[in-house]
Amino acid sequence: MAKKALIAKAARKPKFGVRGYTRCQRCGRPHSVYRKFGLCRVCLREMAHRGELPGVTKSSW
């Protein structure tokens, strides 16, 4: 329940712009969120492995 409240709180516009922060759109995780995708590293990795993110490939060198 607390996570839902924090997700709702993060969705509101803060009084001061610097207080805003990103959350994963899929799971609500507040840390390690990639702005380009709007996903945290965990969800990004899962979706990339399943091929749900177009243009994202596993790198090898």
Swiss-Prot record:
UniProt KW keywords: Metal-binding, Ribonucleoprotein, Ribosomal protein, RNA-binding, rRNA-binding, Zinc
Cofactor(s) the protein requires to work: Zn(2+)
Manner of cofactor binding, per the entry note: Binds 1 zinc ion per subunit.
Disulfide bond entries: none
Superkingdom classification of source: Bacteria
Signal sequence, renumbered to the chain: none
The keyword Transferase is assigned to this record: no
Residue numbers binding Zn(2+): 24, 27, 40, 43
Stored Pfam families: Ribosomal_S14
One term of GO molecular function: zinc ion binding
InterPro entries: Ribosomal_uS14, Ribosomal_uS14_bact, Ribosomal_uS14_CS, Ribosomal_uS14_sf
GO CC terms, sorted: cytoplasm; small ribosomal subunit
An individual GO BP term: translation
Annotated PANTHER family: 30S RIBOSOMAL PROTEIN S14 (PTHR19836), SMALL RIBOSOMAL SUBUNIT PROTEIN US14M (PTHR19836:SF19)
Record function comment: Binds 16S rRNA, required for the assembly of 30S particles and may also be responsible for determining the conformation of the 16S rRNA at the A site.
Subunit text: Part of the 30S ribosomal subunit. Contacts proteins S3 and S10.
HAMAP family in alphabetical order: Ribosomal_uS14_2_B
Stated family: Belongs to the universal ribosomal protein uS14 family. Zinc-binding uS14 subfamily.
Name of the protein this chain belongs to: Small ribosomal subunit protein uS14B
